[in-house]
Amino acid sequence: MSNQGKDSFKAYSYFCPCGQLFLTIHVSLTRLPQRQLDKRHVVDEKLNHIAHFSTGNKYYITRSDGGYEQRIQLLCRRCTLECAYALEAAPGYIYVDPTLVNEKPVTVSVSNLKE
């Protein structure tokens, strides 16, 4: 096991069921808050992360309270499964489905992070 210097740190990578890397972030999703509506983990895009997904279509869903929301699909680059979404009304957050992604601890180089 190598030492982690100032140029790298421990992070967590999340993979689509097809095996494609989807998201890398410095904290486990289990430590992040969950959205009450659908139990998705809420990732603030201000956190250091590396996004490995593509943006899909916008669509509307009807909520149980009678309201609606517009979502933006965040898709696996390989199989196009929607592993997460973003909300049009709340930019800056990613809502990740914990039932669709598999976690793997990794070491990340600081130079690869999105600021």
From Swiss-Prot:
Gene Ontology CC annotations of this record: endoplasmic reticulum
Disulfide feature: none
Source domain of life: Eukaryota
InterPro entries xref list: STEEP-like
GO terms (BP aspect): endoplasmic reticulum to Golgi vesicle-mediated transport
Transmembrane segments: none
Known role: May stimulate membrane curvature formation and subsequent endoplasmic reticulum exit site (ERES) establishment.
Family affiliation: Belongs to the STEEP1 family.
PANTHER family according to UniProt: STING ER EXIT PROTEIN, UPF0428 PROTEIN CXORF56
Protein name, as recorded: ER exit protein
Organism: Schizosaccharomyces pombe (strain 972 / ATCC 24843)
Phylogenetic classification of the source organism: Eukaryota, Fungi, Dikarya, Ascomycota, Taphrinomycotina
